[in-house]
Design a protein with these regions (language model features):
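Hydrophobic alpha-helical
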Residues: 23-25, 29-49, 118, 132-200
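Short, solvent-exposed amphipathic alpha-helices that sit
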Residues: 1, 81-85, 109-129, 143, ...
């Protein structure tokens, strides 16, 4: 199997340009991770017209877009990830406290769905927990740090932080430490992804939990592309296998074996 790759620099307009280039090259299958949920209908129609199956990777597209325009999606269940983060947060806070939420990129399906899972669970099950702020850190460590510093200056007391990814959580940890507080103790922190740095923080006690969202999807992408090329049917949503990691589960051996 021959692989053609384009780096879109996290810009949807670059992704659309790359997809059109792949159409012009006459590739057999196109796989991409939508930066945001909206704006894909026209280019997906072009793929369909060209007879090229499309695999969505890691993130989905707006539910209002005709799902027949893509063939399958290989991704984590981001709503589930948000729900699991809420379950752990509720336990850590004993059902009562003030929580802030560090959102990912606005408009990204991972942002929307992780927030949905977390907020809906809290609303339905935890009347004593108040989510006082939702602010985007754009999935970056620097922005996570800056946003957390701003929230600490705005709110007199914060009990918990839910970060939509580990990078923002690691930035938030820095901001909390700079404010003279103990992350993981004074302020409980939960994030999503399960990267090596997050595992190290869990082991150190500065991060309470990370909900895994594995990026290691290449094997599934290649297997699915091969199946599509062979004319085989595939599931509409292929869910990746993820887990929840708290201090009782993270070991140095797991950290050493982490490749991302």
């Amino acid at each position: 199997m021959e692989l053609h790759f384009a780096d879109a620099q996290q810009k949807p307009e670059n992704q659309i340009k790359a997809i059109r280039d792949f159409i012009d090259r006459g590739v057999d299958v196109i796989a991409f991770a939508p930066v945001i949920e909206t704006g894909w209908e026209e280019v997906l129609q072009e793929c369909q017209k060209a007879g090229i199956p499309v695999i969505l990777v890691d993130r989905g597209i707006d539910a209002g877009i005709d799902s027949s325009l893509y063939t399958t999606m290989i991704a984590s269940d981001h709503v589930w990830a948000g729900e699991q983060a809420a379950v752990v947060m509720a336990e850590l806070l004993s059902g009562s406290g003030v929580v802030v939420e560090l959102q990912g990129t606005i408009g990204a399906s991972a942002t929307i769905q992780r927030e949905q899972g977390f907020d809906d669970y809290m609303a339905a099950n935890c009347p004593g927990i108040q989510i006082v702020a939702h602010q985007s850190g754009d999935f970056t460590r620097d922005q996570g740090r800056a946003v957390m510093a701003e929230l600490l200056a705005t709110y007199e007391h914060i009990d918990g932080v839910f970060a939509h990814n580990d990078d923002m959580a690691l930035g938030a940890i820095e901001a909390i430490q700079e404010a003279g507080l103990k992350p993981g103790e004074d302020i409980k922190i939960i994030s999503v992804d399960g990267v090596k740095g997050a595992f190290e923080a869990v082991l150190a006690g500065t991060l309470n939990c990370t909900v895994e969202c594995t990026p290691l999807l290449a094997a599934q992408i290649f297997d699915t592309a091969a199946a599509l090329k062979a004319g085989e049917a595939v599931d509409k949503w292929i869910v990746s296998n993820d887990d929840i990691y708290t201090a009782d589960k993270v070991t140095q051996e797991i950290i050493d074996g982490r490749t991302y």
